[in-house]
Amino acid sequence: MKLTFNINYDTVFGEEVLLNIVETDSKGAKKTSQFRMNNRDGKHWWYELNRKEATLNTSLDYYYSVDCDWADSRHEWLTETHRLELSAVKGREYTVYDHWADVPEDSYLYSSAFTECVNRRPLPSIRPSAYDKTVRLIVRAPQLRTFEQLAVVGKPKSMGAWDVFKALPMYEHNYNEWIVDLNVETLDGEVLEFKFAALNTADTQHPLWETGMNREIHLPEIKNGEVVVYELSQAFFDICNRKLAGTLVPVFSLRSKTSYGIGDFGDLKKMIDWVAVTHQRVLQVLPINDTTTTHTWTDSYPYSCISIFALHPQYADLRQLPPLKDGKKSNDFEALRQELNALKQIDYERVNDAKQKYLHEIYQQEGKEMLKSKAFKQFFADSEQWLVPYAQYCYLRDKYGKADFSTWPDHQVWNEKERKQLSTPSSKEYKEVEFFYFVQFVLNQQMEAVHAYAREKGVILKGDIPIGVNRNGCDVWMEPKYFNLNGQAGAPPDDFSVNGQNWGFPTYNWDEMVKDGCKWWVRRFQNMNKYFDAYRIDHVLGFFRIWEIPSDAVHGLLGQFAPSLGMSREEIEGYGLHFLEDQFTKPFISDWIIDRVFHERAAEVKQRFLNHTHDDIYELKPEFSTQRKVEVAFEGKTSDADIWLRDGLYALISNVLFVRDRKDPNKFHPRISAQFDFTYEALYDSDKAVFNRIYNDYYYRRNNQFWYREAMKKLPKLVQATRMLVCAEDLGMVPDCVPWVMNNLKILSLELQSMPKDPHVRFGYLGSNPYRSVCTISSHDMPTLRQWWDEDFERTQAYYNSMLYRGGAAPHPLPGWLARDIVGRHLMSPSMLCILSVQDWLAIDEKLRLADQNAERINIPANPKHYWRYRMHVSIEDLMQNTDFRENVTELVCQSGRE
């Protein structure tokens, strides 16, 4: 069978267009074969491919790319490639006319969030045609809704003679891509004139015509047995952009009458029911990966995962497991369940201990048979790459009583040679770790079932991908080459934390990751695709540059962006600032600073912690020269006076004007937020002005193009690794290059009215939100709406008058009717998604919401040791039965057009 591919693409000397055929082997692995195309004039490219092995009713997926001698090659959008169906019974030769496909503006409509949840239409099998001569039309129409089908109508009688009710129906052979084969013998003349129409399968009397002029194709001479394929430009219809509403709630925060003191995957199903019944379409959760390092409450931090693949055992729905045969044990577990479920907050340690014991009991009772099942064998085959190392890591962590593998007596790094023994059921090593296989199998089955259930209900499950991983976790243990362990990831100062955030995660070795095409990240995203149809990239700024903090620092103020372009002494002095290296890069400590920080304890501080150097200048004693040393010195001291003293010493240590580059000791970076510190205060006014210019150039201009290129090395591969809808958390110190990249890749931004991206306004204007965005009132890192309302009365008053357009004094606490008004305004915004926390939804009902608004806070970012234990005070069953609240939410959603 002869296949000829044609595409018009303007090139310059040195550029070549390549045809890339994508084939899938028996194991599901994709292999791409490249063919250099021929060229007549630098614009028209073609390639003739002979496929002896081609068979009827098969298809070929392919895309085009451009190879270039002097720059990176580029390729088409890969989320949906071209597809050629070999479905013509008499077809011996296919001639294809394609056009180049970049990322479309409406790429979100091709995401599984829309194709599998919102506009769900099952793809039919290939439909053969049996014409002697065939013209095939292929067109994309992503706007079509679930109940619509594309049809073509044209001038020839065989195409309906412009009677739309006699139009030829097309079929969807790929997501949002429709196809029809035409018999050339029934077409009139050499010019084919036609148009597309959307037919309502439920209401056939009101078809919808595509916009624009009639389409025309000048038909070539077509031989018997030839199929000429035209891929046409997208069909557009007068259909409004879809807007959807949703709820954000961590899985652990869910409460049902039958849960085990913490939300689980069974509760998640129940929450999907509530979301669906209130006409919402999105349910967003926080990360659900395993975080277990100490088996204590400090493991409650969901963003510190030990494995990017493994799910947390605490989310196992024990109700779905076979009942315990031991009646006494069963009764004991039930009594404990009722006790834990009655608690207002999560008791992380007791809950996890109880669930682990129950899982062990079920494993002893049922594990042998479950691990013989076909389902387990398939799961193991699909997951072996990460599952085997994870299981051994968990076994060794528990055996040695600590997760810090660098202190283990053996196995300080994963040994690939041990995989075979750990994968052989008859081996001793397998027996040691098979419990962890069992638990992950149970969790995977339950979460996949939740995902399928959400799709059936038309609800988009939205997950969360943390930017970091635990430095003592399995991922670092297994593949240390991908991580830098000589620093800590965090965030610069922002509205959440004046000292910045230190997450303690290792930073990524992007040079190593990019070498293999970011396979580690691609595997991560593809694994997440099993459970979700949309995801939030936590701290997307980390893909441009990460805030890297020295290992000996506690706060984030001494960090620097990595990678970034540091400044030489000569560059700094070129601005007009005489560079005093010792004074600017070492803590500047003088009498007046000590007095300002420590007041009446100044003399004590000088004696205990400082050495006098000259005049009124001091330096820290060697044993207190870093924040980590100070932290160790004050370990166990918890009085307010001791904490105040410790924090004062932290402030002295971070009192520098520049920090030295982490790789090049001759390069420097302006210290973040230095203008609020004493070393800046000590400068002459003229030097302050110069430093401000250096600071603004460095943070807002100098690195823009550099960071843009860094992000474009990584993000395109990741967002096109799956068909999930991509959303980003782009808050904080956002350089100009971030919206450039997000717009190129069509990533949804996050919009909060209380944290506007425009630095010139106090509150964002909801009507200015871009369509491609997620609108919310508060995130898990922020106070809830009710807390925010009472935090700062002056700010609230300004918001009440200027944004809600109400006169008089703002009422406190926030009344339900006013919370409803605020929620309604957010729902009316242009944003594609409006996802509100469950606490903010509950705020509209004074009878239902929690009396203590401060008990609703999920996380306080300024506190790295925060206990994540918030739990809904009302059960999902009660939410479902509360008719008034359910109808209230439904009315708000429907009035905003977000059904």
Q: What would you call each of these model-derived segments?
A:
Residues 2, 8-58, 67-89, 141-191, ...:
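Aromatic-rich carbohydrate-binding modules that target alpha-glucans
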Residues 1-5, 133-137:
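Structural beta-strand segments of beta-rich domains
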Residues 106-136, 183-186, 208-209, 216-899:
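Catalytic cores of glycan-processing enzymes that make or break glycosidic bonds
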Residues 96-100:
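Boundary detector for helix-to-coil junctions that initiate low-complexity/charged tails
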Residues 6, 20, 65, 85, ...:
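Residues in well-ordered beta-strands of folded domains
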Residues 1, 22-25, 152, 378, ...:
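Polar low-complexity intrinsically disordered regions
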Residues 80-83, 91-92, 228, 232:
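Acidic/polar low-complexity flexible segments
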